[in-house]
């Protein structure tokens, strides 16, 4: 395909137009009085959201240069969302401010690479200041306040705080759609995985369709179990011990399954057979996790063990096991605490060394099952559109709360950025590097100004006022009052704040050092009658 090339100012201004088109749509959502954006869907109901990354993903521009500019800013929002789970709109606003201020300096003839170094050094100094001023999240109320701000709903914040209190920092909190109105929290103590009983005949409670085993032995097998003769020696030992048996294997089939079902129906022996979760290497790893949690051993040819020779000492134990048709929950496994802690440390190390987002996600799930628990927040709403929007807000708020616990919190409302400006006062930079640092200085006020603008206040006057207030004090845009923001519960996780700044600065530096843009030449479309007008809005100065 033929290419079109733009150089110098034309290239940069084309990218800026794309950035402004996207940023102007996203930034109206910032702050407690921000608006929503409606996203059309080709099928089904439209989505109403105030989530920056969701809006950014939907924007596709026609002009090739503008499209590239918008795509670069999408990366800012996406990366911030991936790292911190929130702050996508703030990152977009910062990127727009950095690029706008930077291009003014480009027009004045500043050296691009010098500016870039200045921006990087300034961001490093501001990040250090943010981390230094962060306060640890110590109370349930602080978690509730932080999550509540992210979700725009105090009740959601309180529910997330309760969930984190129950399952711990490493615990899994999932959000599901509910058919009932309102919010519900379900807690699972122990390990749960998404595999249920192989046969419905194993159910001990026909009404609830679940099998409950009290104080069972747990047999873990790394292969298929098909013949009775392999299983019989071990079964006899378990029957003599007078305990029920949970079998977790790659599969249980044929006469082995038939024998277990018949014994259950006759009432001579209570057991449940379940397929092991996952597949391939992940199945082996999860079986090993269950073995450590329950104090058992995976019976596998790889470790020289077979069912025929296995003794009862190789079986795991738990206080209770509940199995439904879809999932298995092991409560209070009998594994050694030190062995479990060692396994947790091993998984954490694997997470840190993993380059794959998918692998990290699966490792995080394994870590949570061993180290914490599982909390399920069920969200309901009056309409499908409202339900989707609410579920998304809760998911963002959960990640926001975890980020707060991880690195601490700083004053929200854009105040932390503005009050970090003094970190640049002691800089000994000259020339274009000093210009780059000044670009960051100017841009740091942009989030607060946008929050003020969305709240119907005068941005410039407010920014000047807040910059002279004591650290941590600023405008609460919800109440229009000046107060100690941390004490008032207006806080942002420092992980979200620093990630937004770092990612915005990274893309801005690329914008400002661009000298040419190569894009696909638009194909000529066949003439069609006009159906309306298109309006465009550029960057807004304060």
From Swiss-Prot:
Q: Return the GO cellular component terms, semicolon-separated.
A: cytoplasm
Q: What is its EC number?
A: 5.6.1.7
Q: Which reaction does it catalyse?
A: ATP + H2O + a folded polypeptide = ADP + phosphate + an unfolded polypeptide
Could you tell me where this protein is found in the cell? Cytoplasm
Protein name as it appears in the record: Chaperonin GroEL
Protein source organism: Nocardia asteroides
Q: Which domain of life is it from?
A: Bacteria
Q: Name where it mostly resides.
A: cytoplasm
- Binding residue positions for ATP: 29-32, 86-90, 413, 492
Which is a GO BP term held by this UniProt record? protein refolding
Keyword tags: ATP-binding, Chaperone, Cytoplasm, Isomerase, Nucleotide-binding
Give the GO molecular function terms: ATP binding; ATP-dependent protein folding chaperone; isomerase activity; unfolded protein binding
**Function recorded in the entry:** Together with its co-chaperonin GroES, plays an essential role in assisting protein folding. The GroEL-GroES system forms a nano-cage that allows encapsulation of the non-native substrate proteins and provides a physical environment optimized to promote and accelerate protein folding.
Show the stretches that span the lipid bilayer: none
- A Pfam match: Cpn60_TCP1
Q: How does it assemble?
A: Forms a cylinder of 14 subunits composed of two heptameric rings stacked back-to-back. Interacts with the co-chaperonin GroES.
């Amino acid at each position: 395909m033929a290419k079109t090339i733009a150089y110098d100012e034309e290239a940069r201004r084309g990218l800026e137009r794309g950035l402004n088109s996207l940023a102007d749509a996203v930034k109206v959502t910032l702050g407690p009085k921000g608006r929503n954006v409606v996203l059309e869907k080709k099928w089904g109901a439209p989505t109403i959201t105030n989530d920056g990354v969701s809006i950014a993903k939907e924007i596709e521009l026609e002009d090739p240069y503008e499209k590239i500019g918008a795509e670069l800013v999408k990366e800012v929002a996406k990366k911030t969302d991936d790292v911190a789970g929130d702050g996508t709109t703030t990152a977009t606003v910062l990127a727009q401010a950095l690029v706008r201020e930077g291009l003014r300096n480009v027009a004045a003839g500043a050296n691009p690479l010098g500016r870039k170094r200045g921006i990087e050094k300034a961001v490093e100094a501001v990040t250090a200041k943010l981390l230094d001023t962060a306060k640890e999240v110590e109370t349930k109320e602080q978690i509730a306040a932080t999550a509540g701000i992210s979700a725009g709903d105090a009740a959601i914040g309180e529910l997330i705080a309760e969930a984190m209190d129950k399952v711990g920092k490493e615990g899994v909190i999932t959000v599901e759609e509910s058919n009932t109105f309102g919010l519900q929290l379900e807690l699972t103590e122990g390990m749960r995985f998404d595999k249920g009983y192989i046969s419905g005949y194993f159910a001990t409670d026909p009404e609830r369709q679940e099998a409950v085993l009290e104080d069972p032995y747990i047999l873990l097998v790394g292969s298929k179990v098909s013949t009775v003769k392999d299983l019989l020696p071990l079964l006899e030992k378990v029957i003599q011990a007078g305990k029920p048996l949970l079998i977790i294997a790659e599969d249980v089939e044929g006469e082995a399954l038939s024998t277990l079902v018949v014994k259950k129906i006759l009432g001579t022996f209570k057991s449940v057979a379940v397929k092991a979760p996952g597949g391939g290497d992940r199945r082996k790893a999860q079986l090993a996790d269950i073995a450590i949690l329950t104090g058992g051993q995976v019976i596998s040819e790889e470790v020289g063990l077979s069912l025929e020779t296995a003794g009862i000492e190789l079986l795991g134990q738990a206080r209770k096991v509940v199995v439904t048709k879809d999932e298995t929950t092991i409560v209070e496994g009998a594994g050694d605490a030190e062995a479990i802690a060692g396994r947790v440390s091993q998984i954490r190390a694997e997470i840190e060394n993993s380059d794959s987002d998918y692998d990290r996600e699966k490792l995080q799930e394994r870590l949570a099952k061993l180290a914490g628990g599982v909390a399920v927040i069920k969200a309901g709403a009056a309409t499908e559109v409202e339900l989707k929007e609410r579920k998304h807000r809760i998911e963002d708020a959960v990640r926001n709360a975890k980020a707060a616990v991880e690195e601490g919190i700083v004053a929200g409302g854009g105040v932390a950025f503005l009050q970090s400006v003094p970190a640049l006062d002691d800089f000994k930079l000259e020339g274009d590097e000093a210009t780059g640092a000044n670009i960051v200085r100017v841009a740091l006020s942009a989030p607060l100004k946008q929050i003020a603008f969305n709240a119907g206040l005068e941005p410039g006057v407010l920014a000047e006022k807040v910059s002279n207030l004591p650290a941590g004090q600023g405008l609460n845009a919800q109440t229009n009052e000046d107060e100690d923001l941390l004490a008032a519960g207006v806080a942002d996780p420092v992980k979200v704040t620093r990630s937004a700044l770092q990612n915005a600065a990274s893309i801005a530096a690329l914008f400002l050092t661009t000298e040419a843009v190569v894009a696909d030449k638009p194909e000529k479309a066949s003439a069609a009658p006009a159906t309306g007008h298109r309006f465009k809005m550029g960057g807004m100065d304060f």
